[in-house]
């Protein structure tokens, strides 16, 4: 079955270093869902400047909960009921589309790429940008489902291991935005440093300048119990997520040092 891709739109097509571009739903959704924060940009008519907020969110499908990352998914964003973005989303219509237009992005750093000259330095990274229209979720069943989805995106199974479901006050004070995605793109860099031919032929520079990649990843430390914690041991689901997550991110960072297959990724 062919891999689904987002359509290339003028606002979503990668122009510079476009050999690094990806439009695969699976790739883009994977980057978004692996990031602890999603940067959400919107325009408020009361301000001369676009607003950008770091938010917590996750891609999923209420209609098809078993859908995988390569399927068509919505982005669910979690926020306070009376925040500026939530208020705008309740009343916004744009060009016939229902909801407020949003641009959303996420980036994962995999390494520092150190070259012979400052101009050739880079990062190994995975970034994604999505464009869509957001409306508040009003159906209570979908809202509860989305709250569980977002909570478990922070720590898997955390929702089931807390007092749940949310009480009435919590439901009233929390809003969930559902973003229907119109387009998206990803940009990925992996591999070693690459320098200009002139610098590569400069033996003096090459003799004194270390070049290579410093892999980088998010590392979770040992959990520290809260002052009113009464659970003697760190729960197994939490420790498993921490240990396995650390190892997975470490593996990905070192994997990114390898040169990409020609024609697959830019450098």
PLM-predicted stretches and their roles:
Residues 41, 58, 105-107, 133, ...:
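Residue-level recognition of well-ordered beta-strand positions that form the cores
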Residues 65-74, 80-146:
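Short, structured beta-strand-loop surface elements
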Residues 29-31, 67, 92-96, 167-171, ...:
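A general structural signal for short secondary-structure junctions and capping/turn motifs
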Residues 36-38, 102, 175-177:
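Structural beta-strand/beta-sheet cores of well-ordered domains, especially the beta-sheet scaffolds
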């Amino acid at each position: 079955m062919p891999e689904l891709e987002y359509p290339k739109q003028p606002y979503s097509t990668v122009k510079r270093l476009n050999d690094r571009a990806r439009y695969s739903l699976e790739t883009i959704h994977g980057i978004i869902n692996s990031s602890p924060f999603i940067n959400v940009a919107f325009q408020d008519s009361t301000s001369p400047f676009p607003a950008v907020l770091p938010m917590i969110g996750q891609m999923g499908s209420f209609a098809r909960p078993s859908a995988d990352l390569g399927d068509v998914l919505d982005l669910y964003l979690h926020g306070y009921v009376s925040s500026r973005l939530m208020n705008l989303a309740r009343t916004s219509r744009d060009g016939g589309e229902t909801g407020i237009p949003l641009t959303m992005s996420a980036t994962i750093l995999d390494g520092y790429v150190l070259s012979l000259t400052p101009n050739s330095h880079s990062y190994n990274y995975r970034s994604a940008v999505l464009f869509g229209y957001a409306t508040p979720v009003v159906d209570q069943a979908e809202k509860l489902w989305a709250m569980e989805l977002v909570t478990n995106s922070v720590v898997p199974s955390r929702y089931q291991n807390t007092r749940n479901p949310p009480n009435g006050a919590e439901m009233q004070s929390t809003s969930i935005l559902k973003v229907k995605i119109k387009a998206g793109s990803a940009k990925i860099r992996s591999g070693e440093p690459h320098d200009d031919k002139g610098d590569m032929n400069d033996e003096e520079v090459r003799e004194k300048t270390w070049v290579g990649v410093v892999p980088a990843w998010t590392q979770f430390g040992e959990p520290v119990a809260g002052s009113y914690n009464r659970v003697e041991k760190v729960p197994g689901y939490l420790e498993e997520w921490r240990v396995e997550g650390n190892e997975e991110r470490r593996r990905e960072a070192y994997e990114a040092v390898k040169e990409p297959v020609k024609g697959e990724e830019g450098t």
